[in-house]
Amino acid sequence: AYNATPGATDAALFLGMINSFSHNTKVTAGIELAVQRNYPKGSILNPDNEYTSNANPWAQTVTLNNIGFGAVSRAMFCFGYLEEAFCIDGNWGAWQGQGTAKDGTAYGFTNFEWLGGSARGAWCFKDGEPLAWAAWSQMATIGDAEEFESTVPPMFYLGRKLLPGYFGSGKYRGGPGESAVHWCVEPGKHIGITRPNGGLSSTASVALGMNGAYPGPSSFMISARGTNLDEVNKKGLAPRDARELLEMTDSGELKVDDLQVWKMDCPELSMKNNDLFVDAAGSSGGWGDPLDRDPNAVIEDLNSGVSYFTNTSRGT
């Protein structure tokens, strides 16, 4: 549910304020004194129905808060506090669902690794960092793949890595987002997967590129059902991220009966043996005009694999 009580909304706002422009790890009375809030009665942040579910206020408040935090970051820049000025993004992701094991045991699950940490947007003087920041947590961590595998019995990681080119370009680029490929193995009687997401389910990701830079790309996921993964695995060529999966599909190396790229919350997807589910999130925006980027930084990104080479030409 995307409703929230005023108290829960305050909690989401205050946590984000700490990470965005405050030098502390705890909420203090200073925030209460410094910030004015207005939650109109009957709005989703102050429902007039006392029985309204309000279990997930972060989903929509992240996007709303980022607008405010971005404005504060611009103000820091204008006042000359350059070390405090960066592009504030909250492009989180997660996936959830339910299943029934072979013996009839029912279970539910959530994989929230891309909620634990996302990329920090570009600073006004340097590139952003991957996985190092989250507006809603003072200790960003995406957790261990093995732990998430233990909570979703049929789904195993084929890859979990930063996605090349998955950031907002600028004089200083944003930190790259991340992608994981999940392999369905002997799912029992049933497993269904859906996807809640801050950039898909409630609102679009806020375009937060600063001073002429591009914003970070929004989250997305891919479902590949009915594959020849057994043959691909024998060659040791299983896809490790979203880009590799699409490239292998285009080349015919990976055969897929039903391939879907989801840029919105997907309906429940029933997964079978050797089906693949790919998610990508956590990208961030850049700072400054991309044409002003140091050519040596462009070369370094290409050599390190943070960016990828695209051979294009444009006529006039």
What are these language model-derived features?
Residues 1-316:
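Glycine/proline-enriched, intrinsically flexible loops and inter-domain linkers
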